[in-house]
């Protein structure tokens, strides 16, 4: 009888301890979403006040923000974060921002000298296509894939990763 009561008590302890873990996970996830929203809000406020379309990459040692051109391999990450913020929060204020920063990358679809166009267009246009049903983004995605395919080397069976200048060819 003592063994049965001990087993029952242990089972009860295990089952009750499992319930709190879910709340901790939910809080952890929500805290991270809230943090991302706060960071994106600060960044978009700064950019929108500038009157320019800027693409942040990192914070410099002096605390200033480093912005990048659209042909930088990280250029799709900021628009992608706008799409993720829109998707995670459902807040409509993020939709026009996601569209604006995504559509600023339109010319990336023609980059044939860059092997990272998948990051650039996947994070931006592809997220818009799948998260907001932006069917018009499909043409940009396909054109980008065609540009990237010009880097395919049949003998190697791979896409060339060598960066070329705009005037050079593979």
Where are these regions (language model features)?
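Bacterial Sec-dependent N-terminal signal peptides
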Residues: 1-26
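Low-complexity, Ser/Thr/Pro/Gly-enriched N-terminal "stalk/linker" regions
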Residues: 22-76, 84, 88, 92-93, ...
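Well-ordered alpha-helical segments within folded domains of soluble proteins
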Residues: 71-86, 113-130, 165
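Flexible, solvent-exposed coil segments and beta strand-coil junctions
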Residues: 101-104
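Short coil/turn connectors between adjacent alpha-helices in alpha-solenoid helical repeat scaffolds
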Residues: 131-136
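Single conserved hydrophobic/aromatic residue that forms the stacking wall/gate
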Residues: 163-170
